[in-house]
Amino acid sequence: MAYQVLVICVVSSIVFAYIVWRKERKKKLPPSPKGLPIIGHLHLVSPIPHQDFYKLSLRHGPIMQLFLGSVPCVVASTAEAAKEFLKTHEINFSNRPGQNVAVQFLTYVFGPYGPSVKFIKKLCMSELLGGRMLDQFLPVRQQETKKFIKRVLQKGIAGEAVDFGGEFMRLSNNIISRMTMNQTSSEDEKQAEEMRMLVADVAELMGTFNVSDFIWFLKPFDLQGFNKRIRKTRIRFDAVLDRIIKQREEERRNNKEIGGTRQFKDILDVLLDIGEDDSSEIKLTKENIKAFIMDIFVAGTDTSAATMEWAMAELINNPCVLEKARQEIDAVVGNSRIIEESDIVNLPYLQAIVRETLRIHPGGPLIVRESSKSVVVCGYEIPAKTRLFVNVWAIGRDPNHWENPFEFRPERFFENGQSQLDVRGQHYHFIPFGSGRRSCPGTSLALQIVHVNLAIMIQCFQWKFDNGNNKVDMEEKSGITLPRAHPIICVPVPRLNPFPVM
């Protein structure tokens, strides 16, 4: 019986694909490589899709069509193509595809564009991640940075190796934890580790290829155990955040009973205030609040940590760049104190290093959207419900905009007007944080974390490797962000003597 059902499904899929093919061939569609029945072009795409899309675009052009199973897709691989989709036709491509993970966790980052997403974006820019809130949390970032330095320094004195990625992830997670829920991971290491693992699992699920998302007749079957993993992760997610929110609600009730107020409001307090405000533009439920907290952890922790790790990898492999950055920091800051956020504005070469890192290793290598209706883009007909991939990774390697694009050379940002390039999506050949109404609302926070902590690694330490050649591997692995395939592990050697008192 099961065999007969499978045969019927396969035959139906072939017939359906043929009908669609006959219908679509009459339209002027983007160029496309040859596909196969049922799977379309899935065989051409690996777990690191941005690399495969880039190679295919060299043959088929800046706008190409793919069928990932039964899902029609279009890939934009140049700045000009990206501008057409993200600016000229922005409204039509404001939705994001409703994948199973996004549905289960009700995320705003990966959900469809609508009133709730608009409200949260406005709230982020004005309140949650705006300038006033970032200024309020400056002492938090400073405290966590000092703890980070002390951990690395202690390992250096003991001659122990440091895992860059692990330390950067812990730092980012601690900052986000305290900004969001005013909790320090050192105060409750068990809960902090639970949260770190939960964030890592959700990020992995969001970046994992699930065949049932792409081949329609497999949707009822959980062939990879993917749905089971989502359900188990969701249970853990609910348990952790329900406990945190319940505890905070009790604290707020107790404060009201004694006539007091919380002098220091974190992001959770702001969200709960809105949830209790009957006049609010959008009524936030507890599920909405949990979804936003998960978004800020996944988006804020992973990307900042990965960017710092890639930057250190590039500096280690380019010692002349590292030395030039060190000289700039020594000239501006000196050796008697540790660099602070207020120093960054006076360190243009450091800023160029971060920009160059984001060009080659963008935190989100693909911008994923979905068309809400049929539209003509650059003369090509793009049907409704077509999944859009803007290949940010490929755009950063386009020789039409970047001279010697595979070379790590921060000096390029002082040449040919490139110093005016902004990371916030106004220049489409440099969009590491996306562009338009669905760009990353946490850009300012991410840049603050990355700049100052990268500068501290340059100023305070030199690095000793066991591999003998002082070079690190630059291989990527699959993920929703851009993780490294191999960790950077080396022994920190304190550079400042005496080391400044913290």
UniProtKB/Swiss-Prot annotation:
Principal subcellular localisation of the protein: membrane
PANTHER family per UniProt: CYTOCHROME P450, CYTOCHROME P450 93A3-LIKE
Annotated binding of heme, by residue: 440
The name this protein goes by in its record: Cytochrome P450 93A2
Cofactors that this protein relies on: heme
Keyword DNA repair (UniProt): no
Name of the top EC class for this enzyme: oxidoreductase
Molecular function via GO: heme binding; iron ion binding; oxidoreductase activity, acting on paired donors, with incorporation or reduction of molecular oxygen, NAD(P)H as one donor, and incorporation of one atom of oxygen
Compartmental location: Membrane
Gene Ontology cellular component annotations, sorted alphabetically: membrane
Gene3D superfamilies, alphabetized: Cytochrome P450
Transmembrane segments: none
Pfam family, any one: p450
Alphabetical keyword list: Heme, Iron, Membrane, Metal-binding, Monooxygenase, Oxidoreductase
Keyword rRNA-binding on entry: no
Upper classification of the organism: Eukaryota, Viridiplantae, Streptophyta, Embryophyta, Tracheophyta
This enzyme's EC code(s): 1.14.-.-
Family: Belongs to the cytochrome P450 family.
The species this protein was found in: Glycine max
Induction: By methyl jasmonate (meJA).
Organism domain of life: Eukaryota
